[in-house]
Amino acid sequence: MHNRAVKQYLEYLKISGIQDIFIKPPIQIDKTELLKGLEEKYKNCTNCILHEKRTNFCYGNGNADAKLMIIGEGPGADEDKLGKVFVGRSGQLLTKMLSAIKLSREDVYIANIVKCRPPENRNPLPEEKSACLPYLDEQISVIQPELILMLGKVAAVTLL
């Protein structure tokens, strides 16, 4: 609203008999705690067949206030074992790539399209991706990154 419109609105309220206006301060949200709560809420997901053989639900990890969010395809064997994203060979490569551009894993948030490991590291099926996309949408909404880097064809095709 422009100043003139605000002034007119306040005049209207005064004429209407309203004498006091109370404005609540914006609510501060701890994004890290919110993401932990969402992970806790979804970690026992059974929305697709991937849950049947998973060891761990790999929600995502990193800086909840990151300007850069990195999204991959899905967890591999190492990730499934540890419950963290990008910790295997591809994670080591990602760490080196980030270092080359003067970033660390603590500067970014990393997630995947699917949160459970597809068998034999196959590409996630459409219904598996559909089951996990609401979780990823929530992560993106909480983090509100300035930039999203999609790693690989599955991530790019799914999100574009």
What are these regions (language model features)?
Residues 1-4:
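Short, small/acidic-rich helices and loops at N termini and domain boundaries
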